[in-house]
Amino acid sequence: MKINKIYTLTAAALLCFAACEEYDQHVNYTASEPTSEIGKKLVANTDYIYSIYNDDTYELHSGVEVTELAYLNNEGRSIRTFWYKIDLTNPDITLECITPNNNSFVSAANEQLSSMLSHVDKPGHVVLGGINTDFGGGLGPQGVYWKGGVCLKDKFTPLADRPRCFVSITKDKKVFIGTEAEYPDYLAANGSKMSEVFCGSPRLIVDGKIDIAVPNDLDSESHPRTAIGVMPDMTTVYLMVVDGRRYTYSNGMYLKILADMFMALGCEQALNLDGGGSSTFIVAREGEYGDPARMDVRNWPNDGGGVERLLHNGLAIVANTK
């Protein structure tokens, strides 16, 4: 019995030594390096990314790239982001405002984004994906709203402590972000050129500088966000969703961090859109045109355990392939 104990202790010691020796050979852990263009710029130009565990980029069509970037931030919290990079100089690609049931008027929030996108998805006018856009209230979006060159809502609904801003996409596909105060003059000068307009708040970047026009206490919590950034050429656009309110999955962003992200990419202008449970990022997959099942929700809307919220409006990314 004594001999058996000696053998047992000796074997345990050898196993322990072997384990320690193996550990010594693998103690140098290195976080994965970014592989996407977006990931590389965010790592190089911000201090928010501590360790990347997913950085995947794929092209839906020439001029439309998706990047899905997941990481631990500098506080050790999980963050999952979803990005579109869109080149509007590609003659096939357009950004188009959409409404519930493809109505030619604004209405109450009564349709999910995936269903809204499916209404305009057809041969020759192929939906590649989309995001949610403006905050909603009552019978429509809170800001002015244009669809296909037609103004569906011509007034801004006041939002306390958050100056309203608009995004205009002209018929020649130039993207401009301005304030409610600037809208009358912009409309007078560009009304005949305007195609799509949607709104959001607050503005994040103005003329290449961070300028968030809200009281600090409105940026005291990290939330799911949706946002748009525009490069100086006015034809390169970033659309972004970050998930939040789910600790082990993703923890959202403060507005300041959101602004820093778009600054890191080189955006000249950026605007926060409706977030929280409205934040939705959709990529169209193979399938039958007009079928909502073709619309793949890539993020995790935090309403109802990942269920899409009913929305007032959205933005479609379209390939015109006629």
Which role fits each region the language model picked out?
Residues 1-9:
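Bacterial N-terminal signal peptides that target proteins for export
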Residues 16-19:
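C-terminal motif of bacterial Sec signal peptides marking the signal peptidase cleavage site
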Residues 21-166, 174-177:
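Zymogen propeptides
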Residues 70-74, 79, 193-195, 199-234:
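Conserved beta-alpha junction segments in alpha/beta enzyme cores
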Residues 82-86, 133-134, 165-169, 203, ...:
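Short beta-strand scaffold segments in enzyme catalytic cores
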Residues 128-132, 166-168, 175-178, 229, ...:
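Structural recognition of the beta-strand scaffold that forms the well-ordered cores
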Residues 140-161, 213-214, 218-232, 236-269, ...:
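Conserved, well-ordered active-site substructure
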Residues 161-215:
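A substrate-binding/cap region within the structured catalytic cores of diverse enzymes
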